[in-house]
Amino acid sequence: SRGLGDVYKRQVTTNMEKKISISQIKEVAQEAYNEVKGSTGGKNADYIPYLANIDSKLFGLSICLMNGQTINIGDTDYRFGIESVSKVHTAILILRQYGAQKVLDMIGADATGLPFNSIIAILLENDHPSTPLVNAGAISACSMVQPVGNSDKKWDAIVQNVTELCGSAPQLIDELYKSETATNFNNRSIAWLLKNYNRIYDNPDMALDLYTRQCSLGITAQQLGIAAGTIANNGVNPVTKQTVFEASLAPKITSMISTVGFYEHSGDWMYTAGIPAKSGVGGGVMAVLPGVMGVSAFAPPLDEAGNSVKAQSAIKFIMNKLGLGVFNGDNVTITE
């Protein structure tokens, strides 16, 4: 039995220790980019005119390590609409302002199993909007942003929070904001239905406008990678070294992302990629590997669930090639 114990000990030690060099990560990231770049699957979001006209060949991939080093390949300086990835940022903001339990009580953390803009989900679970990472919960989250009743100061808080997470300021894409405002009929219905169930905590039209504006922020893949890195680094921005939020909130937001980051495809994503990730119809995806790295990718063509085809493929390639994932049980060390 002693021999078996030694074998078990060696196996546990092997499973828990994994060293990966920065050069390996760079090499695999470049492989992923080259592998995916020529893909022609998916199509731009066509229900928002601005997004429909973005160059579908744009593609960028960015990785932020815990030492602050970033790896950037392709169109990582192109500003695209952050769209639903902004839901993660505002979820973090209300977690900072209210604490984890209050957010759970007022919004929730459950996946709906339905499309991100579902009205039916509200009717089925009218006691709470389910999660800040679908449209109903995100609009509710915007209504919670302090100070309640002051749109300008709420907006300042939203932008400041994004700036701290990314290490640099986003820019509002005015054309996208106007395009979204002119076509957000479904979200207007959601906002007022939430009001009917007392699940919105400020003026519904104000909350909807804030949500529409935050989705219209222009951000780069590099900025998004740093934001993912900040979550992975337990709330400390790896580049600026600023403590953006308490470490205790990091697993809360990561659990939300893993549960519903890819909406009704979230289970398939976690099964095949093994890394919590959040998508947006602007083509961006941010992924968080706690304690190791933040990864982001951007490419406009989407699958039927509204997730970037190239971004998914690239991130999945990196995780699988490096043998990384939140469920692997490895203690990963990045070496020079």
Predicted regions and their residues:
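Short, small-residue-biased leader/transition segments that mark boundaries at the very start
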Residues: 1-8
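Non-catalytic interaction/Regulatory regions outside core domains
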Residues: 15-25, 38, 45-55, 81-89
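Active-site-adjacent helix/loop patches that line small-molecule binding or acyl-intermediate pockets
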Residues: 17-41, 94-214
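A short, well-structured edge-of-sheet supersecondary motif
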Residues: 37-73, 286-287
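Active-site SXXK
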Residues: 67-68, 81-104, 227, 295
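Penicillin-binding protein/beta-lactamase superfamily catalytic region
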Residues: 181-184, 192-252, 303-308
